[in-house]
């Protein structure tokens, strides 16, 4: 499956910008709340197989997460922008991997959507997440 890029006319461009602006405004407070990552939905562990410290983050435990399923890509983009993490896609899980300078070891945030994303085929090809740096492993 190939993504075909076409130039938007002015009306389409304006409508798309309006949609993104509305979606962003509606989800920003929820995203900011996610970034607090309280301990009840966040746990560090050492993965002996990959030899990496991992941070398991389960957004489903947050009551607002099911209310914005169509905006997960905004949340992912925002997390990537503010954290600077490289994004690796593995099935229904998204791994954010970043070198931890203080510790000298890589840290990993594993965000598991439990296959709630509808178009996984599109997601794997990067069609839904715009500028995210998605790499299949």
Curated annotation (Swiss-Prot):
<comment type="subunit">
    <text>Interacts with host TBK1.</text>
</comment>
<keyword id="KW-0946">Virion</keyword>
<comment type="similarity">
    <text>Belongs to the asfivirus A137R family.</text>
</comment>
<keyword id="KW-0426">Late protein</keyword>
<protein>
    <recommendedName>
        <fullName>Structural protein A137R</fullName>
    </recommendedName>
</protein>
<comment type="function">
    <text>Plays a role in the inhibition of the host innate immune response. Mechanistically, promotes the autophagy-mediated lysosomal degradation of host TBK1 and affects IRF3 nuclear translocation to block type I IFN production.</text>
</comment>
<dbReference type="GO" id="GO:0030430">
    <property type="term" value="C:host cell cytoplasm"/>
</dbReference>
<dbReference type="GO" id="GO:0044423">
    <property type="term" value="C:virion component"/>
</dbReference>
<keyword id="KW-1035">Host cytoplasm</keyword>
């Amino acid at each position: 499956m190939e993504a075909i890029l076409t130039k938007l006319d002015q009306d389409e461009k304006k409508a798309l910008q309006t949609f993104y602006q509305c979606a962003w405004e509606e989800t920003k407070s929820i995203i900011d709340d996610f970034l607090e990552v309280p301990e009840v939905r966040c746990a560090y562990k050492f993965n002996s197989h990959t030899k990496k410290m991992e941070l398991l983050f389960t957004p489903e435990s947050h009551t607002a997460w099911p209310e914005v399923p169509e905006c997960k890509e905004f949340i992912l983009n925002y997390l990537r922008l503010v954290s600077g993490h490289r994004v690796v896609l593995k099935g229904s899980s998204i791994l954010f991997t970043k070198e931890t300078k203080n510790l000298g070891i890589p840290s990993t945030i594993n965000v598991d959507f439990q296959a709630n994303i509808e178009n996984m085929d599109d997601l794997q090809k990067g069609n839904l997440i715009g500028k995210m740096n998605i790499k299949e492993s």
